[in-house]
A protein has these predicted regions:
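Conserved C-terminal alpha-helix-loop-beta "cap" of PLP-dependent enzymes
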Residues: 166-167, 171-241
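Distinct, well-ordered alpha-helical segments
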Residues: 76-85, 198
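PLP-dependent aminotransferase-class I/II
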Residues: 1-41, 46-53
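Active-site-proximal loop/turn and secondary-structure-junction residues that shape catalytic pockets
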Residues: 40, 71-73, 101, 225-227
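Structural preference for beta-strand elements that scaffold enzyme active sites
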Residues: 33, 64-66, 94, 218-220
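Catalytic PLP-binding core of fold-type I/II PLP enzymes
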Residues: 46-78
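Active-site C-terminal subdomain of aminotransferase-like
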Residues: 25-26, 30-40, 45, 82-184
Length: 243
C-alpha cells in the first residue's frame, strides 16, 4: 500500500523485481501493467517528473502504463498540476478521460497510444456486454465537452469545482480545522469531531473517510460541476456554529 494514495516508482520497481527474482515466479501472476489513478482517491496528483519516471521504467521492462482518469479534468485544472493531457498521451499506453464525474450524462473516453490495443478494444467491449446500440451519443457528449482547447467546457466545469473546493478548505482552516491531506482538486478532507459532524448533518451528509484519532474523523467533501455558490454559502454559515 502507498503512503499517500499514489504509487511510487520505487514501489513499482520493488514489486517487479521481487517477482522476477523469485525462483518460483511462474506460480504467481506475471507483471504486465501499471495502473495509476490520477487524481488519486484522496485528490492528490502525480507530477510530470513522477509520471515520466514511471513511464520510462514501464517501457524499459515491457509493462503497459494505464492511467485511470475518472477525475482527470479536476486534476489537469488544479493549481499543482504541471503536466498536460498531451503529456499523458505521450507517456501512457492508454488512459481514459472521465466524463461522468465532470458533467457528462454517462460514459468515459478511452485513449490508446498504439494501434494494436485500439484494434482489439472493440472486441473486448462486445464480449463484456459494453457495446451500446446508441454509442454515438457518447461521442457527441465528448465532442461538445472538449471543443475549444484549454477554454473547453470540460476544463471550465473542472475549474469551477476546484475553486469551490478551495473555498471549502479556506472556510475550515479559518475555523482552525486541519486538513488531513493537502488536496488541490475537488476533494477536501477536514478532520472533524463528532459534534462538528452533527452540525454539518443539519444540511449535509458528511462522508466518513476514516478514523483519525480518539473523537475525530476524516470527512470527505466533493465538489462537482453542479455545485453552486449557494451551497457554499450554506456550508460557511454552518461553520459559524463551530466553537
Amino acid at each position: 500500500p502507498s503512503a499517500d494514495g499514489r504509487l511510487s516508482l520505487e514501489q513499482i520497481k520493488e514489486c517487479y523485481f521481487n517477482h522476477w527474482n523469485d525462483h518460483s515466479h511462474e506460480h504467481t501472476v506475471q507483471p504486465g501493467m501499471v495502473y495509476l489513478s490520477c487524481p488519486a482517491e484522496n485528490g492528490l496528483i502525480y507530477s510530470k517528473a513522477e509520471l515520466t519516471g514511471i513511464s520510462e521504467f514501464c517501457h524499459q521492462h515491457g509493462l503497459y502504463l494505464f492511467v485511470d482518469g475518472a477525475r482527470l479534468g479536476y486534476g489537469l485544472q488544479s493549481d499543482g498540476c504541471d503536466f498536460t493531457i498531451a503529456d499523458l498521451a505521450r507517456l501512457c499506453d492508454a488512459f481514459y478521460i472521465g466524463g461522468t464525474k465532470v458533467g457528462a450524462l454517462f460514459g468515459e473516453a478511452v485513449v490508446f497510444k498504439g494501434e494494436e490495443m485500439h484494434r482489439s478494444f472493440r472486441y473486448a467491449i462486445k464480449q463484456h456486454g459494453g457495446m451500446l446500440a446508441k454509442g454515438r451519443l457518447l461521442g457527441i457528449q465528448f465532442e461538445q465537452l472538449m471543443k475549444g482547447g484549454e477554454d473547453c467546457l470540460y476544463f471550465k466545469l473542472a475549474r469551477h469545482a476546484n475553486s469551490l473546493a478551495a473555498r471549502i478548505r479556506t472556510a475550515f482552516e479559518k475555523k482552525g480545522i486541519r486538513m488531513w491531506i493537502p488536496s488541490q482538486t475537488n476533494m477536501q478532507f477536514p478532520i472533524l469531531t463528532k459534534e462538528q459532524q452533527e452540525i454539518l448533518g443539519k444540511k449535509y451528509v458528511p462522508e466518513l473517510w476514516g478514523r483519525y484519532d480518539n473523537g475525530r474523523d476524516v470527512v470527505r467533501f466533493c465538489t462537482s460541476w453542479a455545485t453552486t455558490q449557494q451551497s457554499m454559502d450554506t456550508l460557511c454559515s454552518l461553520l459559524k456554529e463551530y466553537k
